[in-house]
Regions:
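A structural signal for multi-pass alpha-helical bundles of membrane permease subunits
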Residues: 2-280
């Protein structure tokens, strides 16, 4: 049986490998090459070396977008995971209606980013108009509007992962801690959190990557206004590639650099958190 599987393994893998190559590997390699070119279309690409990458660091919009994205990501990662974990703790207690609450908290994650952006734009502006201002009048309003939107969308999803982790904590350990006289806080920090580190690793990875890659919510909520001060990296790349004539190569270079930054940060976070995981 094993010999038969090994014999036909390439036949089953080959279609997937071909599809993956055409859908990801070839476009990725082509994208990296085009980041070193000046082009209108891929048929008239002219190699210009590092010129596009030099222009990136002279672009104030990119520098501002990078700083804004970094600040937004730090705040979102902390708030999403803290609130999601608190909700998970509450919903793993023996209270009525936990399944209903889990469903309600998870539902915002099912709504598209563009729709969420416009919904929250209307809601926040309805409040701000009472004070004779709008969401795009001040970068601070746009920043916190994006944070609120991101939290509302992601907390329910992260909560489900934390709930699964908390439910897998051995009850023997919790009972042993209680017998030893540990308080609720001591049990939380010494038993539960170390045991749910795999869930924390997953949630941190997802929030890090999603925070940095945020695009459609940013486009719908503020579109970078005022004066591109609330534009995040993904939106800045879009504006450069499609909105600035002759800057297609620069936009592609920004996309490659963006991929490297997100990959390094996400992989670094995975390494750091996995070191703290406890074998069960």
């Amino acid at each position: 049986m094993q010999k038969t599987l090994k014999r036909y393994f390439p036949i089953f893998v080959l279609p997937t490998l071909i599809a993956f190559s055409f859908a990801f590997i070839i476009p990725f390699v082509m994208g990296v090459y085009l980041s070193f070119c000046k082009f209108k279309t891929i048929t008239n690409a002219q190699f210009v070396g590092l010129e596009n990458y030099i222009k990136i660091f002279a672009d104030k919009d990119f520098v501002n977008a990078f700083g804004f994205t970094l600040k937004f990501s730090v705040v979102s990662i902390v708030t999403i995971n803290v609130f999601a974990f608190i909700l998970a703790l509450a919903l793993t207690r023996k209270i009525k209606g936990t399944n209903l609450f889990r469903t309600v908290f998870f539902m915002p994650n099912l709504i598209g980013g563009i729709i969420l952006g416009y919904i929250w734009q209307q809601m926040i502006n309805a409040v701000l108009l009472k004070y004779e201002t709008t969401l795009v009048a001040n970068p601070t309003y746009g920043f916190w509007g994006l944070v609120i939107l991101m939290n509302w969308q992601m907390i329910g999803y992260m909560m489900i992962i934390y709930v699964a982790g908390l439910q897998n904590v051995p009850t023997d350990l919790i009972e042993a801690a209680e017998i030893d006289g540990a308080t609720s806080l001591q049990t939380l920090f010494k038993v539960k959190i170390p045991m749910v580190m795999p869930s924390i690793t997953i949630c941190l990875f997802l929030t890090v990557s999603n925070s940095f890659k945020l695009f459609d919510q940013n486009l719908a909520l503020t579109a970078g206004a005022p004066s591109k001060k609330t534009a995040m990296l993904a939106l800045d790349i879009y504006n450069t590639f499609y909105g600035r004539n002759g800057y297609e190569g620069v936009g592609q270079a920004k996309a490659v650099l963006f991929f490297i930054v997100v990959a390094v940060i996400a992989l670094g976070q995975l390494v750091l958190t996995r070191r703290k995981e406890v074998e069960q």
